[in-house]
Structure formats: C-alpha cells, structure tokens
Amino acid sequence: MRRIVIKVGSALLSRGHEMAMDRMESLCRFIAELKQKGDEVILVTSAAVAAGYTALALDKRQLPNRQALAAIGQPLLMNLYHQTLAPLGILPAQMLLSAYDFDSRKRTENARNTIEVLLSHGVLPIINENDAVATKELDMLAVFGDNDRLSAHVAHYFSAEILLILSDIDGYYDKNPCEFPDAKIRRVVNFLTPEELEAEVSPNNAFATGGIVTKLQAADFLMKRGQKMFLANGFNLGDARSFLLEGIHCQGTLFVQGGES
C-alpha cells in the first residue's frame, strides 16, 4: 500500500471566474482509481479564493478582500468536492493547516494523528492552507506558494511515498518552452541548483500564487529528505495515471534523490 499526496492548484480548478467542474470530476475519478488499487490518498487543494469569487466578486488585488473570498470560498469548495466524491463512494474530510502547524512538534503530531485515523477509515483528507489568516500567501509572498510547499510538508510529515503535483505544464523543461520551441522536458531530476531555486516567483493566473519555482522548492525539500515528487499536467491526467497506476513514465518529471529512478 502506497501513501500518495496529490496537490492541485487554482489554475486547474478554475476557468476564468468559474470553477472548472470537469477537471475536478476527472481528479476525483483518478483518486477513486488509486484508492481502488489500495493506495492511501491525501489531497492538497487550492482554489478557496476562486470559489469565493463565484459567489461575491470582490477586488482580488486587496488582501482583506482575498481573505474574505477565502472564507466564503472554502466551504463552497468543500461542498463541490463532497458532491463530486459522493457518487464515487468517497467521504472527504477538511483540514486547514498553516506554516505554524509544522513549526510546532505538538501541532504536527496532532495533525498526523488525525490523518492516520482518517486514512484508516478510508476517508480522503482534503488539506488547504488557512487562507483567511495566512496573509503572506494571499499577499503573493507565498509562504507555501499556492500550496506547493505545503504539499511537500504534508508529504514529508505524514510519511507519503510520493507527492504528485498537478500543474498547467507537462513537466520541468530544460529551458522556457514559451521562448524556446526546442525546449525538452527533463524526465528525471536528481539535483536542483541554487539558481533554479531562487528565481523570481511568477503567478500562474489571477487566482494562483505559485509558479515553477515553488514547485522546484517543494521538490528540493523532499529530495533532501529522501522522498520523491512527480510533476505532471493536470489538464490531462494521462501522464499521472500512467505513472501512478501503471508504473509507466510517459511525460512529466520525476524528482528523486541522486541514483534512484
């Protein structure tokens, strides 16, 4: 039995000013397939702000408004997950975490104990950062970078075998594919340079706060602790499905400590 953390961001779960329900449904079916195979799954999700905006169109450029949208949107987001997962026979559970929860050994232990109970009963833990109070993320300073680094902490402290980050790109390219048509996906990465980890963070879209850099920082965090991360396209789950369900590496990038594959 594997324990897998899946992270999905706002760029995938929203389309314009609406929620992308077709993508959420595809994600939930994929999770159901993994669970049917016997895997334990923890989902780290963004998009509370995006969900809130569907109910109240506040100016997202103002931090208090983004916090308010997160407060409005989190229950809406969980309701969408509940409606989508129920026909698949999956019961979801919400957990809101922050950087502080991983700075405190006691709080980390409490969260871990909760996760263990949920997984032991077949429940799907759905984790988001507590955006209504996590001002740094909403202020685009990205404590966890649209939950990229949060998902790495979840994978590490909750003993996952691998973190799957579903993104709006096919993997980690050797150069910017928007500028260089000959850019190629790096299939396996064993090491990341300081230059790669310190580049400027750029948002994916109006709702997202992460970028490729926060994903690399998540990968670096896990590799240094002997754990793996797989970066794949979330618009089409074919590569993620092949890798995790069939053990076939088509596209996508596997980040793993040197020498492994």
UniProtKB/Swiss-Prot annotation:
Location relative to the cell: Cytoplasm
Residues involved in ATP binding: K7, S167, D168, T209, G210, G211, I212, V213, T214, K215
Record key words, sorted: Amino-acid biosynthesis, ATP-binding, Cytoplasm, Kinase, Nucleotide-binding, Proline biosynthesis, Transferase
Its EC number(s): 2.7.2.11
Name of one Pfam family that matches: AA_kinase
Residues annotated to bind substrate: S46, D131, N147
Entries under InterPro entries matching the protein: AceGlu_kinase-like_sf, Asp/Glu/Uridylate_kinase, G5K_ProB, Glu/AcGlu_kinase, Glu_5kinase, Glu_5kinase/COase_Synthase, Glutamate_5-kinase_CS
Main location: cytoplasm
Pathway where it operates: Amino-acid biosynthesis; L-proline biosynthesis; L-glutamate 5-semialdehyde from L-glutamate: step 1/2
Reactions that this protein is recorded to catalyse: L-glutamate + ATP = L-glutamyl 5-phosphate + ADP
Signal peptide (UniProt feature, chain positions): none
Transmembrane segments: none
Role: Catalyzes the transfer of a phosphate group to glutamate to form L-glutamate 5-phosphate.
Entry similarity comment: Belongs to the glutamate 5-kinase family.
Name the UniProt record assigns to this protein: Glutamate 5-kinase
Organism: Wolinella succinogenes (strain ATCC 29543 / DSM 1740 / CCUG 13145 / JCM 31913 / LMG 7466 / NCTC 11488 / FDC 602W)
Gene, per the UniProt record: proB
